[in-house]
């Protein structure tokens, strides 16, 4: 695997950004700029990554491309298309978003209707529109696996890949996001095996974090830093590396640079 972090770390220039990641022993990065930052800035960060020997794991969208308001929805679809084109130009492993929802105030929130046939059809059309307009050749567009919206399981991911029917659509695997039951939690080693067995050949990037069962009733899971939970991280890394020796694995959702550095050191000690 190639280890990276979602933090861009505090930096004053593209060169400092790249060197800080390299100094931590990282091999890949999340791209910290995008289509709204201008071509010169994008090129400068890409060159800095190349000079430091860092691959680019992902370009993020993180906008509601299924927003209820039609104008807002189209605005974010257009943004996603431009982000895919940036990812393609710089050779990122993927451009990634979550599917989004029109059914509530939180754009990435959990609602019953997220699992409706209406949402499914909207999502397939949206993904195809982004891919068919951007027409990437050197990257994949991905929808990250999630706990309360599609895709929320390996089987659902496979159905989505089949429904979208585009070779430019890939899997962005976040295993922790899909650990939503006692069985998946306590037997996460088996769930990891299931994910990589079923999604083999489609996975282009992974998120890396941990998960812990809280002692209070009823069933409550808490995302946490690597090593602070019960996920079989060593197995996760082994499976990802078997899928692709250069598989990006991105540590995410920590607060400070110091927390990211601590998590990096833990993962490096594991593998």
Predicted regions and their residues:
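N-terminal pre-domain/capping segments
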Residues: 1-93, 117, 128, 166-170, ...
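Acidic-and-aromatic substrate-binding clefts and catalytic sites of carbohydrate-active enzymes
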Residues: 7-15, 31-44, 64-74, 103, ...
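Active-site acidic/histidine proton-transfer and metal-coordination neighborhood
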Residues: 15, 51, 70-171
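Acidic/histidine-rich catalytic cores of soluble enzymes
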Residues: 28-29, 59, 128-225, 230
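Short beta-strand segments at enzyme active-site cores
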Residues: 31, 57-59, 92-100, 139-144, ...
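Catalytic-core regions built around general acid/base machinery
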Residues: 41-51, 126-134, 194-198, 235-239
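Short, electropositive alpha-helical surface patch
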Residues: 111-119, 150-165, 221-236, 259-271
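Short helix/strand-capping connector loops at secondary-structure junctions
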Residues: 241-252
